[in-house]
């Protein structure tokens, strides 16, 4: 054991909790949407994509981590490490880019930067395809030699190699690519789109002399936007910041728990996503009930 056995028990219990909550909520999202035709709208396609991404994380990542935490190290070998790292990264990246597409969709629909634009099923499918292409552009390279997946933190799960500058894997360039393309750019797009969305709502409210209905609508949208941005930051900022610090300070001493705690926040997105993006959607909520 790298750390106290109690830490592995806590890790296993936390993974079990994520599976216990994450699987039913995301599966229910898929089921309810398929059962209720009125939910199958282009704008809801990306919410379904979020649920699929979260299920990838639950089934491909959390179950493996829970199993290996019982042994105190990653017992599934190189192939198992590659598979677990791939599916966990794929699910996380699909979710991340789904949030970007969702932000762009809402900006276009609400702010109307393109006059006479009507959001259709084809646009929704293009958004889904984009999120998958971007996710694969991050999760596949470590399988083919650009960086690699290695056991990380408490050695119970696998992730991209931020820790070493292993010869022949070009880990430095991949970390720079990931941090720029798969964190800073998505963060900038989300802040821009939701910032413009808030401004549009406030302008509309001012134009209507701040009626009670408009004020209530503005508050609902504002609350949703604030939660979206906070959810994104809570999930990804600790993990990205810690990974960047480790990359920039290779050779420094840090314990196994140092990277495990930020990973907890990133993995928790499988619960945050449906809570924020679906449970606060009145249509979904009414159909679930």
From Swiss-Prot:
GO terms for molecular function: 11-cis retinal binding; G protein-coupled photoreceptor activity. Phosphorylated on some or all of the serine and threonine residues present in the C-terminal region. Coiled coil: none annotated. Keywords: Cell projection, Chromophore, Disulfide bond, G-protein coupled receptor, Lipoprotein, Membrane, Palmitate, Phosphoprotein, Photoreceptor protein, Receptor, Retinal protein, Sensory transduction, Transducer, Transmembrane, Transmembrane helix, Vision. It comes from the Eukaryota. It is a multi-pass membrane protein. The chain crosses the membrane at residues 8-32, 45-67, 82-104, 124-144, 174-195, 224-245, 258-279. SUPFAM superfamilies: Family A G protein-coupled receptor-like (SSF81321). One of its GO terms (cellular component) is photoreceptor disc membrane. InterPro entries: GPCR_opsins, GPCR_Rhodpsn, GPCR_Rhodpsn_7TM, Opsin, Retinal_BS, Rhodopsin. Its main location: membrane. It is found in: Membrane; Cell projection, Cilium, Photoreceptor outer segment. A motif ('Ionic lock' involved in activated form stabilization) lies at residues 105-107. Residues 33-44, 105-123, 196-223, 280-289 are cytoplasmic. The modification N6-(retinylidene)lysine is found at residue 267. Residues 1-7, 68-81, 145-173, 246-257 are extracellular. Gene3D superfamilies: Rhodopsin 7-helix transmembrane proteins. The record marks 84 as: Plays an important role in the conformation switch to the active conformation. Disulfide bonds join 81-158. Belongs to the G-protein coupled receptor 1 family. Opsin subfamily. Photoreceptor required for image-forming vision at low light intensity. While most salt water fish species use retinal as chromophore, most freshwater fish use 3-dehydroretinal, or a mixture of retinal and 3-dehydroretinal. Light-induced isomerization of 11-cis to all-trans retinal triggers a conformational change that activates signaling via G-proteins. Subsequent receptor phosphorylation mediates displacement of the bound G-protein alpha subunit by arrestin and terminates signaling. This is Rhodopsin. It comes from Comephorus dybowskii. The gene is rho.
């Amino acid at each position: 054991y790298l750390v106290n056995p109690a830490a592995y028990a806590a890790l296993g219990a936390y993974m079990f909790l994520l599976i216990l909550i994450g699987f039913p909520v995301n599966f229910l999202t898929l089921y309810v949407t398929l059962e209720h035709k009125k939910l199958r709208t282009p704008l809801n396609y990306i919410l379904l994509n979020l649920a699929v991404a979260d299920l990838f994380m639950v089934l491909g990542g959390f179950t493996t981590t829970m199993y290996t935490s019982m042994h105190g190290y990653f017992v599934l070998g190189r192939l198992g490490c590659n598979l677990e790292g791939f599916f966990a990264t794929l699910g996380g990246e699909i979710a991340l880019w789904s949030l970007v597409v969702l932000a762009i969709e809402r900006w276009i629909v609400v702010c109307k930067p393109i006059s006479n634009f009507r959001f259709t099923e084809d646009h929704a499918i293009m958004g889904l395809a984009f999120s998958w292409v971007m996710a694969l552009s991050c999760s596949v390279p470590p399988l083919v030699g650009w960086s690699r997946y290695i056991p990380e933190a408490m050695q119970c799960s696998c992730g991209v190699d931020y820790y070493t500058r292993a010869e022949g894997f070009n880990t430095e360039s991949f970390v720079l690519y990931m941090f720029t393309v798969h964190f800073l750019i998505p963060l900038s797009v989300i802040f821009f789109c939701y910032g413009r969305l808030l401004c549009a709502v406030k302008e509309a409210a001012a134009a209507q002399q701040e009626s009670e209905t408009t004020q209530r609508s503005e508050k609902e949208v504002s609350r949703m936007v604030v939660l979206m941005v906070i959810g994104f930051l809570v999930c990804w900022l600790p993990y990205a910041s810690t990974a960047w610090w480790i990359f920039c300070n290779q050779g420094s001493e840090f314990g196994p728990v140092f990277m495990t705690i930020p990973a907890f926040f990133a993995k928790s997105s499988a619960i945050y996503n449906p809570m924020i993006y679906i449970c606060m959607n009145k249509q979904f909520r009414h159909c679930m009930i």
